Amino acid sequence: VRGAEDYNYYLDEYVYAEELGFDGVALNEHHGNPFCMGSVMNVEASILARITKRVKIILIGNPLPVIKHPLRMAEELATIDLISRGRLVAGWVRGAGSEQFFNNANPAYNREMFEEAHDFIIQAWTRPGPWRYEGKHFHYRHVNPWTLPYQKPHPPTFIPGTLSPETIMW
């Protein structure tokens, strides 16, 4: 199967980049289109966290407005940071149109869902539990994450957006 060959080839290339002395390797994620095979970059990142030793693992980035569970995202990324012993750089994106259609997300709420998910994830990494969360788009009766990032207070985060002035200013 061609996909199996490609995924393993890409992972080998990331390992080779570390051997060549690169400081970081970047993974991208897109959904429902043919121009990016990386549809679950957190899985790839967790593999790289284990098979590399030094290189930063840079995620460009998780599409926060289309994820359904920011608590799960916080735990996944904290786990990657733990396995890598602090080499995760978490990037957040609002997601392109294809991500919204693919994930049944309403584009009218894109920005506010992005901001709410981002703020929730940072809280999940830094706020002692248990606590309750009642946001506009996400609701949790009981938040008590025990999987916390290796890096304190949390991994470096960034937003690689360039399309809207609001995102750049945010």
Mark where each language-model region is.
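Short, small-residue-enriched loops and turns at beta-alpha junctions
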Residues: 33-36, 64-68
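Short, acidic/polar
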Residues: 5-16, 73-76, 162-170
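N-terminal small/glycine-rich loop or linker at the start of catalytic domains
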Residues: 1-2, 97, 139-154
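N-terminal beta1-alpha1-beta2 module of alpha/beta enzyme domains
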Residues: 1-59, 152-155
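Flexible, glycine-rich active-site loops centered on histidine and acidic residues
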Residues: 1-3, 66-133
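Hydrophobic/aromatic ligand-binding patch that stacks against planar heteroaromatic rings
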Residues: 47-48, 79-82, 170
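Extended catalytic-interface subdomain
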Residues: 113-125, 140-143, 160, 170
